[in-house]
A protein has these predicted regions:
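Surface-exposed, short loops/turns at beta-strand junctions within beta-sandwich domains
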Residues: 13-20
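Extracellular recognition modules
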Residues: 23-27, 228-230
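Extracellular carbohydrate-recognition regions
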Residues: 35-89
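Extracellular ligand-binding interfaces
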Residues: 42-43, 151, 160-204
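Solvent-exposed strand-to-loop "edge" motifs in beta-rich extracellular domains
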Residues: 52-53, 109-113, 144-163, 170-174
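Short carbohydrate-recognition loop motifs
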Residues: 96-115
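Extracellular carbohydrate recognition and processing domains
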Residues: 189-240, 252
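Extracellular carbohydrate recognition
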Residues: 235-262
Length: 262
């Protein structure tokens, strides 16, 4: 129990069960406080967090049980593959065998020479994707509806091949070697961000290694209504010019991120 000032106290309860009703009452000496009831939030399992499920349609890979990352009810994750395969092979693909951590893993590859847009970082995210050739920046939409408990951490396994910056973007401007990026963001039902956490990989890691980061809440009162988890082989590959047409982030052609078991 923690005392704040002279009259305020707080206590942390551990070992509570998900989605369960509880009653609590404070005892001090021989005095009993009022009984208060509360319900713990329900833990929700997100689909395909082990990246075992993939579907291929032509050159395009989808991290879903259907060849869709837009409006099919079975689609939950998305990639930018539909846009990339206009010019190249899919930049986000499943891998197996010695290239995987367990079963299948996701591999993301950065192209530093894409016609018109300039560059394309491999990505994998909870959300939707619909190619907008006129404004590529608006093609992805990050996040899907979420009504589960407030997560406190995100962990998983990754390895990374960081390449020297070859695409002469202006953001951040002084980057010498590429960086990978994994983050989680939560919004409330008003669309306001309430929590965020991230992992940034700055060097080559040749063997699968565990990553873990805390999720920090800027608002602990509002309940989460939307969640996004995003992974990319180039942290600045999603930075576009003011018209949303051309990448201005610095990336390294050939940078590759592998992830598994979120």
């Amino acid at each position: 129990i923690t005392e704040t000032g002279s009259t305020s106290y707080s206590a942390e309860l551990t070992g509570l069960q998900s989605g369960t009703d509880y009653e609590v009452r404070a005892l001090a000496g021989g005095s009993e406080g009022d009984v208060y009831s509360f319900q713990t939030e329900t833990i929700v399992t997100l689909p395909n967090m082990n990246f075992e499920t993939w579907t291929q349609d032509g050159k395009t890979w989808y991290p879903n049980p259907v060849a869709d990352n837009l409006d099919d009810p079975q689609a939950y994750w998305a990639t930018g593959n539909e846009g990339v395969t206009i010019y190249k092979e899919s930049s986000t693909v499943p891998v197996t065998g010695s290239d995987a951590y367990k079963g299948k893993s996701a591999k993301m590859y950065t192209y530093g020479d894409i016609l018109l847009v300039g560059a394309a970082a491999g990505n994998l995210f909870i959300g939707t994707y619909k190619t907008n050739v006129g404004k590529p920046e608006s093609s992805p939409s990050f996040g899907r509806a979420y009504s589960g408990a407030r997560p406190t951490k995100l962990s998983g396994y990754y390895k990374y091949k960081s390449m020297p910056v070859t695409y002469a973007g202006t953001v951040p401007g002084n980057l010498k070697t590429d960086q990978c990026h994994i983050y989680l963001r939560l919004w409330d039902d008003a669309g306001q961000e309430i929590a965020y956490g991230e992992f940034i990989g700055t060097e080559t890691v040749t063997e699968y290694t565990k990553f873990e980061f805390d999720i920090k809440y800027s608002n602990t009162e509002s309940k989460p209504a939307k969640i996004a988890i995003v992974a990319t082989s180039s942290k600045y590959g999603g930075d576009f010019d003011e018209n949303g047409k051309k990448v201005i982030g610095q990336v390294g052609d050939g940078s590759t991120l592998w992830v598994d078991e979120f």
